[in-house]
């Protein structure tokens, strides 16, 4: 999600303070894992579970919006299945600036992949934050604005282009999605999972 054109626009809107100070963010992502997919997605030896499989998208979205690591993470609900992995969790995150966030991820239920950012002057709604091509910007005193940034093919091309750009320039890491981002998200997911044991 980090390299999609819509996220360039989103970052710009947030940096300009169009919706004011961010107060709350919510995102959800869920589907029913079936068939051969179910084995991998539930198997602890293969990194199974909703948090590792799709929660990374939610937590990545929150990092894009806040630019920070949460100060506190509280699991409001988690369901550990018979395989020993999570098939559902609801997390509440709190950041140093007082912003709060809610992240819901499940591989046992269909959920729309939507997200909302609430600010002091308005809000932004993404009907599908993972395959993000559309967002609706609502600013106090103005008509809602639909912003569209369609992808060229399927969205993965932007990740490929960024890798190609970095290799050509001799970079070891992207400045869009840094090693620091990757380590922070991995540590966050590890800490969340450890809190469930």
List the predicted regions and their residue ranges.
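Predominantly a Rossmann-like dinucleotide-binding segment in NAD(P)-dependent oxidoreductases
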Residues: 3-74, 81
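Short, flexible active-site-adjacent loop segments at beta-strand->alpha-helix junctions, enriched
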Residues: 1, 28-33, 107, 121, ...
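A short glycine-threonine-serine/GTX helix/turn-capping micro-motif
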Residues: 46-52, 145-154
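Contiguous beta-strand/loop segments that form the cofactor/metal-binding neighborhood of enzyme cores
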Residues: 60-133, 150, 161-169
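A general structural signal for well-ordered alpha-helical segments in protein cores
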Residues: 3, 7, 58-59, 88, ...
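A structural signal for the main folded, soluble domain(s) of proteins
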Residues: 137-141
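Active-site loop of classical SDR/Rossmann-like NAD(P)-dependent oxidoreductases
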Residues: 150-161, 177
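C-terminal helix-rich "cap/oligomerization" subdomain common to oxidoreductases
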Residues: 96, 162-197
